[in-house]
Amino acid sequence: MATAYHNLSDYDYESVPCGKDLRIGIAVAEWNHNITEPLMKGAIDTLLEHGVSADNIIVQHVPGTFELTYASAYLAEQHEVDAVIAIGCVVRGDTPHFDYICQGVTQGITQLNVDGFVPVIFGVLTTETMLQAEERAGGKHGNKGTEAAVTALKMAGLERI
């Protein structure tokens, strides 16, 4: 397991670019909001900590994880952001629905990254159990939202190199 010995929230603060002049969009799924809200909070707290102004963080809620692709494209095109963080949570159930949603959102976000000029960060938890999701949304494995925000800052900084 990749996280067996790692807290997702551990990172080298000095390696993260300052976000002072950046605008960051966050698309957040309402489904499994008990997980996505802490992920969003982790992302926002990290962005603020690295200098992104609260006025330059644009949050767009959508009903579910599948809708994150559309919301991410909307944020990139309509709000002129430097990066988008897509936050969602899909927990495996008894039907193939999990596979369809995970595959669809992964392909959608990948396509946005290939076709667009704004990095879209995959902050979607795809877990076997709700406990695994909780452990990655502020639990023993840290907060994946924090990791997604760090990635957004680093990717947005690529244009500035």
From Swiss-Prot:
Origin: domain of life: Bacteria
EC number(s) per entry: 2.5.1.78
Catalytic activity, as annotated: (2S)-2-hydroxy-3-oxobutyl phosphate + 5-amino-6-(D-ribitylamino)uracil = 6,7-dimethyl-8-(1-D-ribityl)lumazine + phosphate + 2 H2O + H(+)
Binding locations of 5-amino-6-(D-ribitylamino)uracil: W31, T65, F66, E67, C89, V90, V91, F122
UniProtKB keywords: Riboflavin biosynthesis, Transferase
An MF annotation (GO) of this entry: 6,7-dimethyl-8-ribityllumazine synthase activity
Pathway(s) this gene product operates in, as recorded in its UniProt entry: Cofactor biosynthesis; riboflavin biosynthesis; riboflavin from 2-hydroxy-3-oxobutyl phosphate and 5-amino-6-(D-ribitylamino)uracil: step 1/2
Active site as annotated: H97
InterPro entries: LS (IPR034964), LS/RS (IPR002180), LS/RS_sf (IPR036467)
Pfam families reported for this sequence: DMRL_synthase (PF00885)
Positions of (2S)-2-hydroxy-3-oxobutyl phosphate binding: D94, T95, R136
Keyword Transferase: yes
HAMAP family per record: Lumazine_synth
Its job: Catalyzes the formation of 6,7-dimethyl-8-ribityllumazine by condensation of 5-amino-6-(D-ribitylamino)uracil with 3,4-dihydroxy-2-butanone 4-phosphate. This is the penultimate step in the biosynthesis of riboflavin.
Stated family: Belongs to the DMRL synthase family.
Descriptive protein name: 6,7-dimethyl-8-ribityllumazine synthase
Species name: Porphyromonas gingivalis (strain ATCC 33277 / DSM 20709 / CIP 103683 / JCM 12257 / NCTC 11834 / 2561)
Lineage, uppermost ranks: Bacteria, Pseudomonadati, Bacteroidota, Bacteroidia, Bacteroidales
